[in-house]
Amino acid sequence: MAAEIAEQPQVWRRLLDEGTDAIAAAAARIAERAPRFVLFVARGTSDHAALYAKYLVEITHGLPAGLVSPSTMTVYGARPDLRDVLYIAVSQSGGSPDLVQSVEVARQQGALTPAVTNNAGSALATAAEIHIDALAGAERSVAATKSYTAELLALYLLLERARGGDGRAADALPDLGAQVLASGELVRNVAQRYRFAQRLITTGRGYSYPTAREAALKLMETSYLSAQAFSGADLLHGPLATVDPQVPVLAVVPEGAGGDAMLPVLARLADRNADVFGVGAAPALENLAGGITLPSGVPDTLSSLLEILPLQQLALHLAIARGGDPDKPRGLRKVTETL
């Protein structure tokens, strides 16, 4: 897991250098079809990449977007009318039968079906009308890290090209990612601080909400913590009552609208005397228990790739601090097949 976390800037560079022609061709087909609605289908970590892309579609394309429950097709036999729908599947392995079947049904029902996977030879890549390779390379860690951020970048480039952009804002990411990863020793110290926690909350808004969800999943997978993710808005609608000084809160507070929307949430957490550790913009972290400052000037559409890096490191170091092995989480397999 440690090696694959460290590899991510190289993975992004490879995708930017070698994957953009295929992505541009896929984007051209999407633009030609001019879909009126976008649906995403995914599981696990890839579901968080899909949620990030849902925000991209709704904010930058001005189209309605949603996340599909594959069971509506695979278990209940639903056959929705998907004409004028862009139906994007996201999967590291491309091997889960429910995703494959849902894409097959979506094609039959009239949707354009791109798939983003890290396995060009997978059943999902074959079932989809268009395949985009995330080019993350073999991922051996059960807890996905580099494939997740590669999916984020592939989805950003695809959707940015589909609306006529060039995606050049992503060119700086490899260097910025290396800069963020250099704070690993600070993250190790944070892990020591929280090693006895039994429960933890993660929170963010907008593009950072998927980051909060992915961070919670990584902590559950590797450290066996009961980690709950909430959008900053939803946290205030009830779950705030569960926060006390013994429940650490990991808050993602980047520059931009999403980070600004988190400021009232931080104020309410302070009222609860919460132990809040932040990842994001320097001004927002000043009054917290601690934090990792991210590079400034990064578009909020791309901040998700940088935000998750220290949180992946935290999951790694927290697992080790608690006596576990993050490379061999109990009860989990690299490829999970569901119907």
Where are these regions (language model features)?
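Glycine-rich phosphate-binding loops that contact phosphosugars or nucleotide phosphates
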Residues: 31-176, 205, 240, 252-297, ...
